[in-house]
From Swiss-Prot:
The keyword Hydrolase does not apply. It holds the Pfam family Ribosomal_L19. This is Large ribosomal subunit protein bL19. GO terms for molecular function: structural constituent of ribosome. Belongs to the bacterial ribosomal protein bL19 family. It comes from Rickettsia typhi (strain ATCC VR-144 / Wilmington). Signal peptide: none annotated. GO terms for biological process: translation. This protein is located at the 30S-50S ribosomal subunit interface and may play a role in the structure and function of the aminoacyl-tRNA binding site.
Length: 138
């Protein structure tokens, strides 16, 4: 590994020290909690910064793995309009990522979902079962 790769790995380990990033791929439905900082002006003229969290839930239509600059694109339907938002995977603004549903798709990039709506835009769900050891009959 060269110097740049070592630097990226160190920064990734620092950024993920207090949060867990799950394994997800295109077709999965994720819920991304984003930190939003609002600036409000009080009555006496002072600025006050308030911090809140906002959830964004949608289908991952693309994932880009490029070290510290990795990102993923999430699409959701809001008030009948398609909305896409790109999140940097290791950004400090991203508070948490939760996988809601696992989808079954045969493509890495699902840009074709932009032109589909309603039932045509559905993705089959992959059911994950935990492997339980079978009881031994004696």
């Amino acid at each position: 590994m060269n110097i740049i790769d070592n630097f990226e790995q160190e920064n990734i380990s620092k950024l993920t020290a207090n949060k867990k990033i799950p394994d997800f791929e295109a077709g999965d439905t994720v819920k991304v909690t984003v930190k939003i900082i609002d600036k409000a002006i009080e009555k006496d003229g002072k600025e006050k910064l308030t911090e809140r969290f906002q959830a964004y839930e949608g289908v991952v239509i693309a994932k880009r793995n490029r070290g510290i600059t990795s990102s993923f694109l999430v699409r959701k339907i809001s008030h009948g309009e398609g909305v896409e938002r790109r999140f940097m995977t290791y950004s400090p603004i991203v508070h948490s990522i939760d996988v809601v549903k696992y989808g079954v798709v045969r493509r890495a990039k699902l840009y074709y979902l932009r032109h589909r709506n309603g039932k045509a835009a559905r993705i089959r769900e992959r059911h994950i079962t935990s492997a339980k050891p079978k009881a031994v009959k004696s």
